[in-house]
UniProtKB/Swiss-Prot annotation:
The lineage of its organism: Bacteria, Pseudomonadati, Pseudomonadota, Alphaproteobacteria, Hyphomicrobiales. Residues 21-37 have a biased composition (Gly residues). It comes from the Bacteria. It comes from Bradyrhizobium diazoefficiens (strain JCM 10833 / BCRC 13528 / IAM 13628 / NBRC 14792 / USDA 110). One of its GO terms (molecular function) is rRNA binding. Belongs to the universal ribosomal protein uL15 family. This is Large ribosomal subunit protein uL15. The gene is rplO.
Length: 161
């Protein structure tokens, strides 16, 4: 057997049908698309249309709303802070705040402020300034000999002080 002897099985590749080549071909005139109108044209799929049945997006009830005043906090856990101290990304002696974390590459940004969460263990004594913190996080920082200062909510750029 040679590479030149290899061929597809008979009938495995069906010949492409060229449509619109006269009624004698069997696929002339409407080319198998039914009647006229929108669906006879190319590239048309009516999104969400279920053949006249009430579509899913109208069968389901509306719920909730989008609060335009919602504040999104960047969140950081204690274990991540400890990793940053161990990797010398932040200095344990100085104040740990948003600016220090961004400068050290721990956070990318904290637009609405920073919130401290209590997952993990903190061994270093840190003085932390955040916009929010959980009770367990505050307790863990104070147990390690540090302190947590809660700041006023961060103001958006262009917002009146």
């Amino acid at each position: 057997m040679k590479l030149s002897d290899i061929a597809d099985n008979a009938g495995s590749r069906k010949k492409r049908m060229r449509v619109g080549r006269g009624i004698g071909s069997g696929k002339g005139k409407q080319s198998g698309r039914g009647g006229k109108g929108q669906t006879a044209r190319s590239g048309v799929r009516i999104k969400g249309f279920e053949g006249g049945q009430m579509p899913m997006h109208r069968r389901l009830p509306k719920r909730g709303f989008n609060n335009i005043f919602r504040v999104e906090f960047a969140e950081i856990n204690l274990d991540r802070l400890q990793e940053a101290v161990d990797a010398k990304k932040i200095d344990a002696g100085s104040v740990v705040n948003v600016e220090a974390l961004v400068k050290g590459g721990v956070l990318r940004r904290a637009k609405g402020g920073l919130r401290l969460l209590g997952r993990g263990e903190l061994k270093s004594k840190l003085n932390i300034e955040v916009h929010g913190a959980t009770k367990t996080a505050i307790a863990a920082v104070e147990k390690a000999g540090g302190s947590v200062k809660i700041l006023a909510p961060a103001k958006e750029e262009g917002e009146a002080a």
